[in-house]
Amino acid sequence: MARTAHIVRETSESHIDLELNLDGTGKTDIDTSVPFYNHMMTALGKHSLIDLTIHAHGDTDIDVHHTVEDTAIVFGEALKQALGDKKGIRRFADATVPLDEALAKAVVDISGRPYCVCSGEPEGYEFCMIGGHFTGSLVRHVMESIAFHAGICLHMQVLAGRDPHHIAEAEFKALARALRFAMEIDPRVDGVPSTKGAL
């Protein structure tokens, strides 16, 4: 069964058209109308091996927040839909990713219980403007939105870093690598990887 999803979400604030394939090769076509976010979501697709197409636009003349958040919501919903009954997945994974002086660790449990803990960001990171439009605070918001709508438990920890761009990129890449391995089908797993029999 193909692990794919295609979701269109339209509100008065944004229009999101997102398609993904969990068993892809990391091919991406990303246009969120927010250049730095394009860069981050492209990295997320590339390093998770998710084929990812996103066409999004919104009221970025007011602020990029709505478009960024709504894209993360739809990405999380698409992950959940594509994972289906979660039979055969590895479920747990972690990844630690450097980018020059920055180091981020992501730990993922595809549990069906949404939870997100972000820690370790340097003081003032949330106020930094990255790429002209994207604030550091949006990184945490994206992680929370993905985790909540995908139904996953995510711990994201910044272990080191000074440059806000490097920190954010290390976080997105760490999430990508952790998702890649957590979503992967393990041929030794028969059914759902839970003692309850459901996730």
UniProtKB/Swiss-Prot annotation:
PROSITE patterns: IGP_DEHYDRATASE_1, IGP_DEHYDRATASE_2. CDD domains: IGPD. GO terms for molecular function: imidazoleglycerol-phosphate dehydratase activity. One of its GO terms (cellular component) is cytoplasm. Pathway: Amino-acid biosynthesis; L-histidine biosynthesis; L-histidine from 5-phospho-alpha-D-ribose 1-diphosphate: step 6/9. Keywords: Amino-acid biosynthesis, Cytoplasm, Histidine biosynthesis, Lyase. The keyword Lyase applies. Its EC number is 4.2.1.19. GO terms for biological process: L-histidine biosynthetic process. It catalyses: D-erythro-1-(imidazol-4-yl)glycerol 3-phosphate = 3-(imidazol-4-yl)-2-oxopropyl phosphate + H2O. It is found in: Cytoplasm. It is an enzyme of class 4 (lyase). Its main location: cytoplasm. It comes from the Bacteria. Belongs to the imidazoleglycerol-phosphate dehydratase family. This is Imidazoleglycerol-phosphate dehydratase.
